[in-house]
């Protein structure tokens, strides 16, 4: 009997092994849906971004007006732009949930997969920042000025590095052109890294809610999880499109609807909501270099998790004290997001500093707590 084409054709065989005959644990919950949702988000962002790039001009004289032109004159351009802007917010929401699930269920023990995942997170954050600059509104210009200026904290090379990135002595036309170039290319690099992420994941197989070896109880990805993912896609698209039609500007900054003016500084400079937790950590450190290091560490610290793992069981579901600590961490991250949007004045400065200490202390207390719980069980 001849084998099916999907099992013999070189290209189809790869797709088959990843999406059809992939052995998957039978008990993975809805928290495992966010990986496929991130794939959907990336496709939405690349497609909407591609059509927006056809009408956008990366020039400081016309960038703001070209976005206006997309809204007013391009057929369904308003939908493309709002879908792209809100799609980014949904992308980051799914990313944070995906990372949170990895931390909760100790998925970071698949070290290569986890490391590539953290690199993807950095890349997506870079892409998001570059995209925020492109409409060339007030917050775009001043956000770019403030964030790129952080590189001046690098000892010895700082000033040259900033001017090299700007392409001059201030954020100007050269800056906008190169930011657009990198914003266009980075999603494709993220797509390539996603393939590597999946490649490493399929070497080991997925983790599951029990944290046990599930080789004795695996089922094919299709039809079971394909349909489960499709249900997730439908719910996600329903929420995203509802959000686009009803709350289209809720997550955008009103300042960014004013054309960029280098002579007028906004009252409060802030990035998009998905960077606010890291921005709050940056502002909490009085020293410039220390703030930049803390900013990078707020994400990079995820890379130390596999090496600080001390628990005998896999996942926080077996550690009640660690569960309390984890959800406390979620609240701390949410409060940091809120603090990042507040002005730099008391009591917000002190609150931000306390929350920053609590944020980083999680990564120290969590392994100690799980070790203590294991000792209690003995």
Swiss-Prot record:
Its function, per the record, reads: Component of the ubiquinol-cytochrome c reductase complex (complex III or cytochrome b-c1 complex) that is part of the mitochondrial respiratory chain. The b-c1 complex mediates electron transfer from ubiquinol to cytochrome c. Contributes to the generation of a proton gradient across the mitochondrial membrane that is then used for ATP synthesis.
Q: Which InterPro entries match?
A: Cyt_b/b6_C (IPR005798), Cyt_b/b6_C_sf (IPR036150), Cyt_b/b6_N (IPR005797), Cytb/b6-like_sf (IPR027387), Cytochrome_b (IPR030689), Cytochrome_b_C_euk/bac (IPR048260), Cytochrome_b_N_euk/bac (IPR048259), Di-haem_cyt_TM (IPR016174)
Q: Where does a ubiquinone bind?
A: 202
User: Which species is listed as the source?
Assistant: Aedes aegypti
What family is this protein classified in? Answer: Belongs to the cytochrome b family.
Does Oxidoreductase appear among the keywords? no
**More info:** Heme 1 (or BL or b562) is low-potential and absorbs at about 562 nm, and heme 2 (or BH or b566) is high-potential and absorbs at about 566 nm.
Which residues are noted in the entry as heme b b566-binding? Answer: 98, 197
Show the GO cellular component annotation of the record. Answer: mitochondrial inner membrane; respiratory chain complex III
Q: Name one GO biological process term.
A: mitochondrial electron transport, ubiquinol to cytochrome c
Q: List the disulfide bonds.
A: none
Cofactor binding comment, as recorded: Binds 2 heme b groups non-covalently.
Q: Name one Pfam family in it.
A: Cytochrom_B_C
Entry cofactors? heme b
Q: Which GO molecular-function terms appear in the entry?
A: metal ion binding; ubiquinol-cytochrome-c reductase activity
Q: Which UniProt keywords apply?
A: Electron transport, Heme, Iron, Membrane, Metal-binding, Mitochondrion, Mitochondrion inner membrane, Respiratory chain, Transmembrane, Transmembrane helix, Transport, Ubiquinone
Q: What quaternary structure, including any partners, is listed in this protein's UniProt entry?
A: The main subunits of complex b-c1 are: cytochrome b, cytochrome c1 and the Rieske protein.
Q: Which residues bind heme b b562?
A: 84, 183
Instruction: Kindly provide the name given to this protein in its UniProt entry.
Output: Cytochrome b
Q: Where in the cell is it found?
A: Mitochondrion inner membrane
Q: How does it sit in the membrane?
A: Multi-pass membrane protein
List residues traversing the bilayer: 34-54, 78-99, 114-134, 179-199, 227-247, 289-309, 321-341, 348-368
């Amino acid at each position: 009997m001849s084998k099916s084409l999907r099992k013999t054709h070189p290209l189809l065989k790869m797709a088959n092994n990843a999406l059809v005959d992939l052995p998957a644990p039978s008990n993975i919950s809805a928290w495992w849906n966010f990986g496929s949702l991130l794939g959907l988000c990336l496709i939405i962002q690349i497609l909407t971004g591609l059509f927006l790039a056809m009408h956008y001009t990366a020039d400081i004289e016309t960038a703001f007006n070209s976005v206006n032109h997309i809204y007013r004159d391009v057929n369904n351009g308003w939908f493309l732009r709002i879908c792209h802007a809100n799609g980014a917010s949904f992308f980051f929401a799914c990313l944070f949930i995906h990372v949170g699930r990895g931390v909760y269920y100790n998925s970071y023990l698949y070290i290569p997969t986890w490391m590539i995942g953290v690199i993807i997170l950095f890349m997506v954050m870079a892409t998001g920042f570059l995209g925020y600059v492109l409409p060339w509104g007030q917050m775009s210009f001043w956000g770019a000025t403030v964030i790129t200026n952080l590189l001046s904290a690098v000892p010895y090379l700082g000033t040259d590095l900033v001017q090299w990135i700007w392409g001059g002595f201030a954020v100007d036309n050269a800056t906008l052109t190169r930011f657009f170039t990198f914003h266009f290319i980075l999603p494709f690099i993220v797509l390539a890294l996603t393939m590597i992420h999946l490649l490493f994941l399929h070497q080991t197989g997925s983790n599951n809610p029990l944290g046990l070896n599930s080789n004795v109880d695996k089922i094919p990805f299709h039809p079971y999880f394909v349909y489960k993912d499709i249900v997730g896609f439908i719910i996600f698209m329903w929420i995203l499109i509802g959000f686009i039609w009803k709350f289209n500007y809720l997550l955008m900054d009103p300042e960014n609807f004013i054309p960029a003016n280098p002579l007028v500084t906004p009252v409060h400079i802030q990035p998009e909501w998905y960077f606010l937790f890291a921005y709050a950590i940056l502002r909490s450190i009085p020293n410039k270099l220390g703030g930049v290091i803390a900013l990078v560490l707020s994400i990079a610290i995820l890379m130390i998790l596999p090496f600080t793992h001390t628990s005998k069981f896999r996942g926080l579901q077996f550690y009640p004290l660690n569960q309390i600590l984890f959800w406390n961490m979620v609240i701390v991250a949410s409060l940091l997001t809120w603090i990042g949007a507040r002005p730099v004045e008391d009591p917000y400065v002190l609150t931000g500093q306390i929350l920053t200490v609590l944020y980083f202390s999680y990564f120290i207390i969590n392994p100690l707590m799980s070790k203590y719980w294991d000792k209690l069980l003995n």
